[in-house]
Amino acid sequence: LVSMVDERAVAWRAHAMGNPVNLPWKLAAANLVPTSTAQK
């Protein structure tokens, strides 16, 4: 379950990062995500 959620989170972040409209959300999410997770 954890891996499934993590994969969905990674996919969501990838989608958000590819959408300029979501830039503010990308920056906010980056501040909420632990460094170890963000660097995966």
UniProtKB/Swiss-Prot annotation:
Any GO MF annotation of the entry: oxidoreductase activity
Protein's organism: Pinus strobus (Eastern white pine)
Protein name: Putative NAD(P)-dependent glyceraldehyde-3-phosphate dehydrogenase PS5
Keyword annotations: Oxidoreductase
Source species, domain of life: Eukaryota
Residues passing through the membrane, by range: none
Other noteworthy facts: On the 2D-gel the determined pI of this protein is: 3.7, its MW is: 35.1 kDa.
Signal peptide range: none
Enzyme Commission number, as recorded: 1.2.1.-
